[in-house]
């Protein structure tokens, strides 16, 4: 009988990784709902780095200013050479200007390098701080937060969003300051040099940018469609991959291939249009620059023939036009990058500002030498205020007893154990361990009294030894091997290439039963005063189940044990069976007593054998 009552957004643990489904990639059109507010939060978060960032921005602006002085000096050099064509070139003056020009460019390059180095250092430190704060936040959030959020979404905030913030701050801020300085500075220098040629360059540039804006607007919808199609095809691949056995069993390969072909064609079409239009941008930028050069040359030639300007002005303007058009595209790219950073920051700060569990530093009560008496007194709980799952639950478990919790799907069995562990806080009544209410003791102390064996096994990428002694210090090899022998795992582990030092990864093929045996051995090694078992033997064969059951019976001696059982045949020897329905205890007693009552438990028990027959 299946028993997994619903909790909002529940994710099943036990997998060492996952595929990226739809929506994992950020599309180019994503924006923050509050751009100014989000950047204000980000700046406030990074305030300790602001003095260094300001120095980096000054370096960026200084390097750009020195670059802007280059054309003016080049104009002077051209003028000196022009005058020397008749009377002889003054090499001292030309050399002096040349060395000054080289000094400007070298200093500009050093300032630009300094800006890049400072920003790279700062952004990596900020990323490290963000990841550290998120990691700490994960441990302070209540379980209810995770029941409302998907694992992929939380992982995306730790990895993708933090990386987006880092890249945007490293590249966009410095580039934006440099681009704005270059744009304003080149415009100022052009007006300072000649107004007519400046207006000519601006008009020529505007014509090209109008064309670029039209194409950008048309291409944006194809980029959005491309991201949507990419998400669909990723989701389809994930579904087919995870359900590959079922697809094979039902001969669904042709149908899956046809669906993939349709999605693949849609992606190809949208990506082709998006990339074609995007591919027009570089030649358009080249066209804008060339158009500016042509306009400046024509206007300069006319003005030179009239004697209004000299040839050196045209030379300077040729460089100023490049400086004028170049930052416009950089500003647009930086603005888009800042939008992406704001969107990522919004998600990160939404997580960091989520309501945490109550601070328990002032709680002084402790659980010492726990015997294992547990009492539930008129407990009330609901995942939402308007959806109460447990209404008025009361029960008493004596130290060393084996308590079985049974009931139909959604009765509240797993929820009850979560409340006992203080994964969730009760809304009424109290739960006591040895007479001490659990809400008067720190959560960590409550957790330290239990070891758990869940239906969904959890193993991490580490050695067999590390998985067995997880968070249990000073475990001897003999104690570890004794636990493995008790669950019938020792022989299998010794057949592995490196025995207990074998790293558990995708190359080590463990059956579900072996994974479960490993987690049971972990619980035996932990040696806590109380146990929680959630259908611990549901995924193993009959022989292994009997072996594990005998080991668990030995482990549960003199320990209070709570067993969530879906197969009632496995709990006949329980000291007390609590029958839950709609969050309330409707029957309690031993197996024989409940069968004799011929009530709800008897119906559940008999229905399993009726289905088996």
Predicted regions and their residues:
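Alpha-helical segments in transporter systems
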Residues: 19, 40-43, 51-76, 97, ...
